[in-house]
């Protein structure tokens, strides 16, 4: 059985990690996507300038702060399978802020190693042209190579993103699966090892009307982690799978395509759900049941991916 994960937003209590992990385990999950991005607003730094943040603490202080988080998996068996780094992670023309973000990333990677988290999403930057987007991605990620190489068992994951334009959504100019393959392979060649992987966000693929199975098959072994959630094809809703119907009849997303694609590439990572909107969509007294339903969907998919059904 593949592990079933969910992001930490809303249910995680910073003051009591152990109780939080015990709660999410009771909901049927055995993995967590930890939102370390909540500890730094990079957009605020870019807008207002450098200021003191959580990451100005020494690495010793930060690891001490996260010691209860490290102990929670050891006591519950619920692993931290992935993290989400602060984002945006790059601001063109603002090297002062970019340098600060790299310092924060260094400490995020250290936390990953400390809590035995093997993957962290670092959002790729955009650009006005495909060439500019490549240059921005190369500038950001290649500067992270000497940093990530300091930490054992931690991989940086890129993600398929989109940009919101007036009355439309625009795919990231390097988000075609073939372009991601080229970028990932080039980065790993530069790094001299397997330091970069891919986070496939199915919700973003829905918005951009991608053929999910084909996308996954093209990425193949590079698919390291997942962001699983549903939407109506218009808004990035982050709802549980099977929530959205087209014309009240058919699912907006072809979920069979997702399961078949993961099965075809031999995916054996965590089925990680990024479904935080259940906390605003549902009343407080049914949120636990909603989380249990999400975990049940994950177990159903796991059986199909591993060929048990």
Each model region followed by its residue ranges:
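Conserved, mostly hydrophobic/aromatic
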Residues: 24, 32, 73, 112, ...
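Short acidic/polar active-site loop segments enriched in Thr and Asp
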Residues: 30, 79, 118, 154, ...
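N-terminal pre-domain/capping segments
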Residues: 1-114, 193, 197, 221, ...
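Structural detector of well-ordered beta-strand residues that form the stable sheet scaffold
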Residues: 5-7, 81, 120-121, 157, ...
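Active-site acidic/histidine proton-transfer and metal-coordination neighborhood
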Residues: 74-75, 89-197, 207, 285, ...
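Gly/Pro-rich active-site loop or hairpin
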Residues: 13-14, 21, 50-54, 59, ...
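Alpha-helix-loop-beta-strand connector modules within alpha/beta enzyme cores
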Residues: 55-83, 140-151, 181-187, 254-256
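Active-site beta-loop-alpha junctions enriched in small/polar residues
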Residues: 7-11, 35-39, 85-88, 125-127, ...
